[in-house]
């Protein structure tokens, strides 16, 4: 199960710590054992350590991870790890300071320090999410592979998806990952398939791993998807690519719905899961 989307500008619709933990507890009771906090930027919440601590304490939870831009990790990595967060995905599209600033408005140095802090705190694995953008960073994959090798991290090459962006931007920036997969196949000493992670391929190169996330026109991405998302305003989202089939769980919770009713809402969301990519 994953959290999703930017933090709400309206404090009334943003979930409290207790509400987040309650939803996760219901999910774990249904057999969901892995939770990832995403965003937006989850580290922007001042109560993020409390959220981590309370979720990690839920009996039956096997794995708790987070996707972050890494900017605030330097000061938070040790505390997050100590309170139960064990794995991290850090968004890092480039190692070029100017390109990074143009893409994000932030400082590359802050993220690089965050990567170092995460590794030193004990997080494993630490994955670097490199979203491939045509003409922006598509020519720097070899450099990123070397950085992952040097830092003991795993590089994830991620294909751009047409989500929350204009059609014009998508068509101008999207680049298929086929050529990178061909290159990785030639260099790999081993190729691993993560069946329950959309059949993703992990290429084991000497002293480094590279994972390829290829969702576009990929029927396996849907066939092997086991994820259910929760938006920051408390809606269950059955499909990453769709917004028309959300199930509101926060409103019933605030109106006093018992756990049996909330469990039924999870089952409804699961029933609404339909493949986006079809053969």
Go through each PLM region and give its residues.
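Canonical Radical SAM [4Fe-4S] cluster-binding loop centered on the CxxxCxxC motif
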Residues: 1-15, 239-240
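A short local structural element in Rossmann-fold oxidoreductases
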Residues: 1, 77-78, 100-101, 241, ...
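A short acidic, helix-capping loop that chelates divalent metal ions and anchors anionic groups
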Residues: 4-10, 96-102, 164-168, 247-248
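Radical SAM/AdoMet-radical enzyme domain recognition
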Residues: 14-37, 45-156
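Accessory C-terminal segments flanking Radical SAM cores
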Residues: 162-278
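Conserved G/P- and acidic residue-centered "switch" motifs that form tight phosphate/ATP-binding loops
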Residues: 41
